[in-house]
């Protein structure tokens, strides 16, 4: 439920805030490639959830489709010269510093997610509301905050395409990776 709510929050909240903040010019490739891929993943989730269960096979298909998408995306963009697009500060950073920040970010993300889930469960119990409702609403909005922050920073840095790409990529990864891998591990997920 959190994944569904997060994807809705990404489109409804994050994209709305971005649209209010600035004029977004979208390239043709977005309509021809990126948007249809997100739509395919969303429809795949819809079809797989018609029986209210995401099985291991469903998870395998979603994750395999994600791997195909990643391969397609990398091979499509490999031809572009990305050297000019790399931030100068990143080029000057040492591998040690990047690894340290990645480790700190990963640990912070893990514990932040733990606090978010524990807090949401406690809140649901105290308010006498189902955990599913809290998952689709409060937790989903909470998990969309990083996308909102990244999109706003992209707008400030004049990278408007990145702000929309961030949302599309997040929605695709929520379905293909988070839900796909979870279904592979847990066998059955009830939606």
Predicted regions and their residues:
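Hydrophobic alpha-helical segments, chiefly the membrane-spanning helices
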Residues: 1-189
């Amino acid at each position: 439920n959190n994944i569904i709510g997060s994807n809705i929050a990404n489109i409804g909240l994050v994209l709305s805030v971005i649209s209010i903040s600035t004029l977004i010019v979208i390239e043709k490739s977005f309509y021809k490639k990126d948007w249809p891929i997100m739509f395919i993943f969303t429809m795949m989730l819809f079809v797989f959830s018609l029986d209210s269960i995401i099985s291991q096979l469903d998870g395998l298909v979603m994750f395999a489709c994600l791997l195909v998408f990643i391969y397609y995306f990398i091979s499509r963009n490999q031809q572009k010269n990305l050297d000019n697009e790399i931030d100068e500060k990143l080029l000057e950073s040492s591998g040690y510093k990047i690894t340290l920040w990645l480790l700190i970010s990963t640990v912070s993300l893990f514990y932040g997610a733990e606090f978010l889930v524990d807090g949401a469960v406690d809140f649901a119990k105290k308010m006498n509301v189902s955990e599913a409702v809290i998952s689709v609403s409060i937790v989903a909005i909470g998990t969309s905050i990083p996308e909102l922050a990244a999109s706003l920073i992209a707008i400030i840095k004049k990278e408007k395409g990145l702000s929309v790409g961030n949302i599309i990529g997040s929605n695709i990864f929520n379905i293909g990776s988070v839900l796909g891998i979870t279904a592979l591990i847990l066998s059955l997920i009830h939606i």
